[in-house]
Amino acid sequence: MSSEHKRSLPAVTLAAIGVVYGDIGTSPLYTLRECLSGQFGFGVEPHSVFGFLSLIFWLLVLVVSLKYLTYVMRADNAGEGGILTLMSLAGRNTSDRMTSVLVIMGLIGGSFFYGEVVITPAISVMSAMEGLEIAAPAMDSYIVPLSIVVLTLLFIIQKHGTGSVGKLFAPVMLIWFLTLGVLGVRGIIANPEVLQALNPMYAVRFFIEYKAVSFFALGAVVLAITGVEALYADMGHFGKFPIRLAWFTVVLPSLVLNYFGQGALLLKNPEAIKNPFFLLAPDWALIPLMVLATLATVIASQAVISGVFSLTRQAVRLGYLPPMRIVHTSDMESGQIYIPAINWMLYIAVVIVIVSFEHSSNLAAAYGIAVTGTMVITSILFCTVAVKNWLWNRYLAWVLLVGLLIIDVPMFLANVVKILSGGWLPLALGMVMFIIMTTWKSERFRLLRRLHEHGNSLDAMIASLEKSPPTRVPGTAVYFSRATRVIPFALLHNLKHNKILHERVVLLTMRTEDAPYVLNARRVTVEQLSPTFWRVIANYGWRETPDVEEVFQRCWQEGLTCQMMETSFFMSNESLIIGERPWYLRLRGKLFMMLSRNALRAADQFEIPPNRLIELGIQVEI
């Protein structure tokens, strides 16, 4: 067992390097340049270079190494991480009011991720392409078109899956990080005094010397840790130890060496501020480095796209987004999915961003507000989990929370002031997603409440039907029921209009549990309610896909035999109308109706054969 673990650990660690660290690993392309480019009033002078390097180093240590890898990754749901997972964990042992607050915070954090995911591919690929400004200045007008071409190809291949090319991600990213380290060492050797910036006093002196202006500089320094949420979100794919091992052995040393190498170059040649990353390389290596940087940024973009697919699936399964088509691109790996609607909406948004902002420096102002906002929420949710779930001492938890927020809040506020210069973009995108998620959840709850208002008792109705049965026809009928104790509307309408009932009636409820996976032993519960009525409850985790055929197989094991092609499936199809509401709630109702019209039908969700499906229309006022 241990030898197998030892053999697999290097492979899993290498895979983590290829997926988890793509975003944070491409930050050296633009971070130091943005810190010292002049927009904050800092010249390329020794004290500012030393100050920024010290800030970057200690952010990597305190935020990534300490906060996320040491503390936040302790909070897992059956091994899974991510902001929505943290939200669900935080709400388990709290009051209803507190749970509502935590849910809103979690949804805001998830919405911030949607805002960030539009910027990451754009700024990463454009930064790589901007190597042309150094390698071939005459071609700088092609940076935007080439960036769009590269990302177009990336979004096109999503539907085919990335399983085959994904095997190349880890080796390419390992080469990338080793290259970062080698380039950094090359710069440090030329000017080793730059290593003095490891001393945190340079960061302290930076704040003392520049006073209020240094606060705004945090808006640029945070670029060094964008992508930090991926460490936690991808925990379920690779495990805690491989992610930590990859960080401390490869990623952190490479990043620190490269940042300090760029700093050494700037101390020696302030003119290199134009693009210190590419100017760190010898002339003969510029084109190969640009190709490698492009590959690394494409991989970083792929990791972000995969992340938004996973987050969307989780939100759909937890009821915060409408059902949509989810394609599994791998028979072996459940995490490899493709969501066409999200893919193409994201592509259109990324292209618009590239065309509108034209240069990665313009996009840098938009980057950061979503990241730091999520960091603040993560700190609060984590400390809530520590107190409520793990029973930590409240005072120690408060001390930890204050310590985390002392770092998170100033960085968030420093990015808030950039709203007019681009920070509005992720905020606007995040707000749209927040409105969609809260609208779908609340209006869906309102709809279900209206559907269940008839108040008829299921047990009483079954007893009545058994005592005075209507005309019974041969076969099995399955009625989908959202609640276990409520009569399905399709059953009521079938009796009302057709006045018949099948010989066997199965009331099927599909549940999504607050866990990524459900044990097979708990998958299906079968309960016989009467000689001809059965209740079947199928439980799935949010990372799993409901499968009616699998449910039938497990029903057979429990003594209830159902054949897919010999069963009639009854569903209700709601036609929505908006009742009397204030104007703002009418707008929300119209948004819900639009989302409902475009949502994936339940029959398609469960892959029910069309010739076995009977839909009964009902009109519902919401």
Curated annotation (Swiss-Prot):
Keywords: Cell inner membrane, Cell membrane, Ion transport, Membrane, Potassium, Potassium transport, Symport, Transmembrane, Transmembrane helix, Transport. Pfam families: K_trans, K_trans_C. InterPro entries: K+_transporter, K_trans_C, K_trans_N, Kup. The keyword Transmembrane applies. The chain crosses the membrane at residues 9-29, 49-69, 101-121, 137-157, 165-185, 212-232, 247-267, 276-296, 337-357, 363-383, 397-417, 419-439. It catalyses: K(+)(in) + H(+)(in) = K(+)(out) + H(+)(out). One of its GO terms (molecular function) is potassium ion transmembrane transporter activity. It is a multi-pass membrane protein. It is found in: Cell inner membrane. GO terms for cellular component: plasma membrane. It comes from the Bacteria. Its main location: membrane. NCBIfam families: kup, PRK10745.1. Belongs to the HAK/KUP transporter (TC 2.A.72) family. Responsible for the low-affinity transport of potassium into the cell. Likely operates as a K(+):H(+) symporter. PANTHER family: LOW AFFINITY POTASSIUM TRANSPORT SYSTEM PROTEIN KUP, OSMOTIC STRESS POTASSIUM TRANSPORTER. This is Low affinity potassium transport system protein Kup. The gene is kup.
